[in-house]
Amino acid sequence: MEIVGCRAEDSSCPFRPPAMLFHGISGGHIQGIMEEMERRSKSEARLAKGAQLNGRDAGMPPLSPEKPALCAGCGGKIADRYYLLAVDKQWHLRCLKCCECKLALESELTCFAKDGSIYCKEDYYRRFSVQRCARCHLGISASEMVMRARDSVYHLSCFTCSTCNKTLTTGDHFGMKDSLVYCRAHFETLLQGEYPPQLSYTELAAKSGGLALPYFNGTGTVQKGRPRKRKSPALGVDIVNYNSGCNENEADHLDRDQQPYPPSQKTKRMRTSFKHHQLRTMKSYFAINHNPDAKDLKQLAQKTGLTKRVLQVWFQNARAKFRRNLLRQENGGVDKADGTSLPAPPSADSGALSPPGTATTLTDLTNPSITVVTAVTSNMDSHESASPSQTTLTNLF
């Protein structure tokens, strides 16, 4: 789009002032004024011829009184001295506008044409861009490198942690929650509900020495021997500590650090207690399956009101205690101090999946033909799941 040419004019000045215009002015002054006007008209004629020659060199024929051009916008004749050339068409200065927002494009650097219509840059990207960045919401051209996560596409510079703005590259672990991207450290703290907003990524790295948090893939781990208290190797704080007791008369507790950041401040531990119906549900399922999968954990979370993470660690500790009891029985020892025992796993030749004494079974609501092997009592209350919604931890390849 450019301003091209002007109308061709005769070298002589077409303006001739009437004699009455100079009434009352002496003859010498009138002659000087006329000479000055003729000199200016000749200089303007030379400039017009130069612009006309430039128009021919650029491939645009100059406008002439004999064959005036038609405006592609309004369809009228172009009688102005200057006009616009865009998409091989001629336009009045006032007629080149965006067909969507009616923005005048005479002073814009670029304009876009699609199916005979003229668009400004914003409207063209909004309507015809193939994909838009999920972070900055700007269009992504076909030649750009992008990062993909789920169904979203990002510019390379926009694929950063929503909390600390750390750039994520290929091979980095990241998490997504509600279409927001988080680095591994902030996603773990987000899941635990213990993130202090005043700390940035650089401050966390300086205090922790690398942010080498363990990766939890959502499945219970199998340990040999007595389970130990797990700690983060980089942060030096407890992740989760669970009591392994399963007594119905006494509520079990989950010990967890309420605020792992900053390490210099001491805070009281938050204790989460199990209720009797929660213990009964978990123990009855443990009698059937020692290692529940994600689908079973979801069903248990809905029935007990506990999070998947809490259920995972409870089953992990229950498996460890069950193995200790087996070792004691093999060695001929009897655990007299512990008055409770976990139910034994079902034998391979047993035909029933549910233990005796249970009234109903927990079924999968999404597929009625599949029965989840979780046995509950008839007076069990249903609870909503307290686990975070739409959260995943993804490894970017």
UniProtKB/Swiss-Prot annotation:
InterPro entries from the UniProt entry: HD (IPR001356), Homeobox_CS (IPR017970), Homeodomain-like_sf (IPR009057), LIM_Homeobox_TF (IPR050453), Znf_LIM (IPR001781)
TM stretches of this protein: none
Signal peptide (from-to): none
Biological processes annotated in GO: cell population proliferation; dorsal spinal cord interneuron anterior axon guidance; female gonad development; gonad morphogenesis; male gonad development; negative regulation of DNA-templated transcription; neuron differentiation; regulation of transcription by RNA polymerase II
One family name in Pfam for this protein: LIM
Record carries keyword Cytoplasm: no
Key word Metal-binding present: yes
Localisation: Nucleus
GO cellular component, one term: nucleus
Domain of life of the native organism: Eukaryota
Region annotation Disordered: where it falls in the sequence: 248-272, 330-364
Main location: nucleus
Gene3D superfamilies from the UniProt entry: Cysteine Rich Protein, Homeodomain-like
Domain called LIM zinc-binding: residue spans: 69-130, 131-193
DNA-binding annotation, residue ranges on this chain: 267-326
Subunit structure: Interacts with LDB1 and LDB2.
Its biological purpose: Involved in gonadal development.
Name by which UniProt lists this protein: LIM/homeobox protein Lhx9
UniProt source species: Bos taurus
Gene name of the encoded protein: LHX9
